[in-house]
Amino acid sequence: MGDWSALGRLLDKVQAYSTAGGKVWLSVLFIFRILVLGTAVESAWGDEQSAFKCNTQQPGCENVCYDKSFPISHVRFWVLQIIFVSTPTLLYLAHVFYLMRKEEKLNRKEEELKAVQNDGGDVELHLKKIELKKFKHGLEEHGKVKMKGSLLRTYIFSIIFKSICEVVFLVIQWYLYGFSLSAVYTCERTPCPHRVDCFLSRPTEKTIFIIFMLVVSLFSLLLNIIELFYVLFKRIKDRVKSRQNTQFPTGTLSPTPKELSTTKYAYYNGCSSPTAPLSPMSPPGYKLATGERTNSCRNYNKQANEQNWANYSTEQNRLGQNGSTISNSHAQAFDYPDDTHEHKKLTPGHELQPLALIDARPCSRASSRMSSRARPDDLDV
């Protein structure tokens, strides 16, 4: 058997760029195929032709009978099978090496452009193009190649080709000599004078190895199928996830903590706020001076809107921002549906008036003495 170290070193590099199923497949290939084929199987088939005997003295009869019984040696057949099955993996490895070389070139070019940028050159467009190329080839992480794009397609192609090779070689093996060996082979072929019987050495041992290699081939085929479905499922999942991210971006507008902490937009009439469940209510003893009031929560929306405009106008006047103050006449009239009343809109003659707070409580004596504001019933001194 030849030296398998060169093929082993190449396949060992694929471990860093394979999925979990691919790593298991490589382990099966190394341990149960190459190792067993290089040690036990070769010694079992070492005397294959020399121990093949026929009950005839006719020169050349044994050679033609051996050629008819075994068109190709089992050992050489399995060597060809390993080579063909490993070829797609080697092609995938070649693609990985190509991307790594591409990354080295892009990194050198990027360093040159950054040096030009440090000198004051405008190379932002070229740097962005290099970043796009790295992202396209899956090179956005330094020193690691991501399985995406063309590399992912190459990997899927390698899995499919490996599976096809496994099936084809199993069919060929079954067609040539089946999955077991007989102790006696009958041969009737020129230059044999008549039908002769030929005998094979250690047929049971060889049959065991044939079944073992058959099981390993079926197991490798199963691993390839599982890995193929895993890669395809992951690819579909990533596409659906990326599509959802594009349709529903995570960056939604939300109120700032400053806006949430302000209490200038109050809600009254005993109805809770639609956005903030714990909104400040009116102080006890105070009432809103509104036109017509109902107990329906639908009217609360209209009153809250009027109160908000009044508060906003008062704050603008207090800050002294003349010219930007919004008068009540600019407030838009909102229609609120009601099941029992008709929709009413504000007419130009009925403008919204600021909501005033009416003190329904009598002032205490202490507050009267402490207050420095003149009252109508105060005595003139």
From Swiss-Prot:
Subcellular location, record wording: Cell membrane; Cell junction, Gap junction
Outcome recorded upon mutating residue 209 to I: In shf(j7e3); short fin ray segments
Region Disordered: start-end pairs: 317-381
One Gene Ontology term of the molecular function aspect: gap junction channel activity
Membrane topology term: Multi-pass membrane protein
Bias kind Polar residues: ranges: 317-331
Disruption phenotype: Morpholino knockdown of the protein results in heart folding defects, reduced hematopoiesis and small eyes.
Extracellular compartment segments: 45-76, 177-207
Sorted UniProt keywords: Cell junction, Cell membrane, Developmental protein, Differentiation, Disulfide bond, Gap junction, Membrane, Transmembrane, Transmembrane helix
Reported tissue expression: Expressed in adult ovary, heart, lens and liver. In growing caudal fins, expressed in cells flanking the germinal region of newly growing segments and in osteoblasts at segment boundaries.
An annotated GO BP: cell-cell signaling
Pfam families: Connexin, Connexin43
Main subcellular location of this protein, as a coarse class: membrane
UniProt-listed InterPro entries: Alpha_helix_dom_sf, Connexin, Connexin43, Connexin43_C, Connexin_C, Connexin_CCC, Connexin_CS, Connexin_N
Domain of life of the native organism: Eukaryota
Family of this protein: Belongs to the connexin family. Alpha-type (group II) subfamily.
Function: One gap junction consists of a cluster of closely packed pairs of transmembrane channels, the connexons, through which materials of low MW diffuse from one cell to a neighboring cell. Plays an essential role in gap junction communication in the ventricles.
Official protein name in the record: Gap junction alpha-1 protein
Protein's organism: Danio rerio (Zebrafish)
